[in-house]
Curated annotation (Swiss-Prot):
Gene: rplB
GO cellular component term, pick one: large ribosomal subunit
Family per similarity comment: Belongs to the universal ribosomal protein uL2 family.
Gene3D superfamilies from the UniProt entry: 2.30.30.30, Nucleic acid-binding proteins, Ribosomal protein L2, domain 3
Protein name: Large ribosomal subunit protein uL2
Chain spans, region Disordered: 223-275
Keywords linked to the UniProt accession: Ribonucleoprotein, Ribosomal protein, RNA-binding, rRNA-binding
Domain of life of the source: Bacteria
Species annotation: Shewanella pealeana (strain ATCC 700345 / ANG-SQ1)
Amino acid sequence: MAVIKCKPTSPGRRHLVKVVNSDLHKGKPFAGLLAKKSKSGGRNNTGRITVRHIGGGHKQHYRLIDFKRNKDGIPAKVERLEYDPNRTANIALVLYADGERRYILAAKGMKAGDKIQSGIDAEIKSGNALPLRNIPVGSVVHAVEMKPAKGAQIARSAGAYVQVIARDGAYATLRLRSGEMRKVPVDCRATLGEVGNAEHMLRQLGKAGAKRWRGVRPTVRGVAMNPVDHPHGGGEGRTSGGRHPVSPWGQPTKGYKTRSNKRTDKYIVRRRNKK
C-alpha cells in the first residue's frame, strides 16, 4: 500500500493525501454478510441530540465481521480483501472448507489466496486465531477478547496490535499500544499479527466536504458562542475563554480523567502512559 500526495489542481486537492489500496476488491461486497445500517443524526429515541457533530454522509451497509473466530479445525482461504466504511481497518472475505464465508479483519501482510485457521491446533502465523494460552509469550496479536467467547474488543483498528508479555495461571498479561498493561483470561482468543492498513494514519482528507461524506458535521468553538450556549462564550471582542478548557456542560476537557469502573481496576497492572 502506498501513500500518494495529490497535485494542487484545486483547493480541495492541495492538501489531499490518499492511501492507495490497489489490492482491494473493486466490486460489490458479499451480500450474505451485509446488514441494514440506519442513520440517527446523533439523536436518541426522543429526538434530542445526544452526540454532537453527526449527520448526513453517504448511505452505508454494515459488514457482519466474525470477531469470535470460533470455527475451529476447519481451514479457510482468503478470497479477497475489501474496504469497510465502518472501520479504519480493511476486511478479508474468507471461504471455509465446508463452504461457509465470513468476514474477518485483514491482518498485516494478508493477501488473496492465503490459508488461515482457528483453534488450539492452528499454526503460529499471522492471521490465525488461538486462545491466549496457546500463543507464545512475546507474540504480537490483535483482535483480542476480554471475556472468553464474547468476541474481540481490543486492538481492532488499522495498524493496532498488543503484545503478550506474560502468562501466569488463569491470566495472560498484555501490553497495549497506550502503554497500559492489562490481565486477560488465557481462554480468550486473539489473532496473531498486526491489523493491516497501518498507513491509514498518514491520510489527509484535504477538504471539509470529505468529512461530510463520512457523516461528520462542523464543530463550533465554545469561544465563538454566546454565554447561554457555552461556558467559554461571550465577552467583548475576541477572548481566550478565560478558564481551563471545558465541554459545553462544564466538564474539564483535554486530559481530564473520567474513567470510573472499579469492578475491572484489578485487571489493570499498569496505567497507560501520560501524553
